[in-house]
């Protein structure tokens, strides 16, 4: 079955060529709050486990499950919410994911034992995963082609705030007389607040004109934000599995799906393993480090290296292009991870270690962590856009699951060299996937992207 024919490129020419408006900034902020919680939780769960292990006598299996269960659930959430948003519309589903996320965070904070915590983190993960395809696609479908990359990447860049607030709040709480039991519960519960804060605003957002047009609505939806608020579900009834079939039946679309999903899987393997296991990595520097000292060190790394990487990615996304940034990022990740793996006793060289480790964060953010989020919001036809993004995000979370679950075992097997060596290898693979399977999308409308020149792999399978 061939992919759906693209709409005329003139249908949305006015909105495609428009500048950035207040409406765009509002949508960006509303869409980004879920990613604050995503990154916040990604960091603080490492701190939480450091606090819980001596109190609950947590073994390696339980530790791995606590840190990785939310990632498996996020894969399910991305698939589910992504498909439903293509079936019923972005508006109908938007906001439900943050309620699920908040419920999971609050319930996790009330957990009486490790197994309840694992179960509630599964609920949290469903909400986190559901946010990926819907938020990215809403921002992409509203943005003009000249600024789309920046706006979508800025939605994702809200992670930077979560990565900074997480260790900052943890450090503040660790200086108080509160018990560790109270501290970890407060840390987890706090993640629900940003998500709940944008629930009402998400429910008020109007349906994207591109979805209305593709769903063959009777109203004119060519870029008019004010009128793009209603659509009749009865006019669009499709099978849940229809979108998946449309993605895999067209060879060109399938190659792009494999490229986007493969690159995201490889990136998240390295990224999540490194970030969630950061207390283990920093312990390699000094066995005497307290939880507070390691938390402050991680905060410094995020502020100095990760946050500028997010910012630079957003500012250059529409200038350098997605493909250039992703190839550069994967390449430099391979170099930095490789240095950490190959330099003898690198963990004993405090400042060189921190600089190299920090640069790995910088080029992850100014690299595939941003672009793997942007790509799937652009390269698929509108009727399967959130479905495609959901599949790619799910593969990313699956890669994160593998990284989180295996990273501690790499560390215990052969120390830092094994863990960082594995991250370097998958970074090289990610570079190859990007170079041969993904197109450049900068400066093109979403409708044009269905007709742009093929990649080498797309030509080979045509």
Model-identified regions with their sequence ranges:
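Transmembrane-helix signature of 12-pass secondary carriers
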Residues: 1-462
């Amino acid at each position: 079955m061939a992919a759906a024919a693209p709409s005329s490129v003139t249908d949305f020419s006015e909105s495609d060529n428009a500048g950035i408006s207040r409406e765009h900034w509002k949508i960006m902020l509303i869409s980004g709050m879920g990613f604050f919680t995503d990154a916040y939780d990604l960091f603080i769960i490492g701190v939480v486990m450091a606090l819980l292990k001596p109190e609950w006598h947590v073994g390696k299996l339980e530790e791995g499950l606590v840190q990785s269960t939310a990632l498996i659930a996020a894969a399910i959430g991305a698939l589910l919410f992504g498909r439903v948003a293509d079936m019923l519309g972005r508006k109908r589903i938007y906001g439900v994911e943050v309620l699920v996320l908040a419920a999971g965070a609050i319930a996790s904070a009330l957990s009486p034992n490790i197994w309840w915590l694992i179960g509630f983190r599964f609920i949290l993960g469903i909400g986190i995963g559901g946010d990926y395809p819907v938020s990215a696609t809403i921002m992409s479908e509203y943005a003009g082609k000249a600024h789309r990359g920046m706006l979508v990447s800025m939605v994702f860049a809200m992670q930077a705030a979560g990565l900074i607030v997480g260790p900052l709040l943890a450090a503040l709480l660790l200086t108080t007389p509160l018990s560790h039991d109270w501290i970890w519960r407060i840390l987890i519960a706090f993640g629900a607040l940003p998500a709940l804060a944008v629930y009402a605003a998400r429910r008020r957002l109007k349906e994207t004109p591109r979805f209305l047009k593709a769903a063959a609505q009777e109203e004119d939806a060519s870029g008019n934000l004010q009128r793009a608020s209603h659509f009749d579900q009865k006019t669009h009834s499709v099978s849940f599995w229809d979108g998946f079939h449309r993605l895999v039946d067209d060879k060109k679309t399938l190659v792009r799906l494999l490229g986007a999903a493969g690159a995201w899987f490889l990136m998240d393997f390295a990224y999540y393993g490194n970030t969630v296991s950061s207390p283990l990595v920093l312990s390699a520097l000094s066995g005497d480090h307290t939880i507070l000292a390691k938390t402050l060190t991680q905060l410094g790394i995020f502020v100095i290296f990760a946050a500028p990487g997010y910012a630079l990615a957003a500012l250059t996304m529409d200038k350098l292009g997605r493909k250039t940034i992703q190839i550069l990022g994967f390449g430099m990740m391979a170099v930095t991870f490789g240095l950490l793996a190959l330099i003898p006793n690198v963990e004993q060289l405090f400042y060189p270690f921190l600089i190299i480790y920090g640069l790995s964060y910088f080029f992850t953010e100014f690299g595939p962590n941003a672009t793997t989020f942007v790509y799937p919001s652009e390269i698929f036809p509108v009727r399967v856009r959130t479905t495609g993004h959901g599949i790619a995000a799910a593969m990313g979370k699956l890669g994160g699951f593998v990284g989180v679950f295996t990273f501690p075992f790499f560390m215990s097997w052969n120390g830092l060299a094994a863990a960082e060596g594995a991250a370097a290898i998958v970074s090289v693979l990610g570079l190859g996937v990007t170079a041969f399977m993904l197109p450049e999308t900068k400066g093109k409308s979403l409708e044009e992207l269905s007709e742009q020149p093929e990649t080498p792999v797309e030509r080979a399978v045509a």
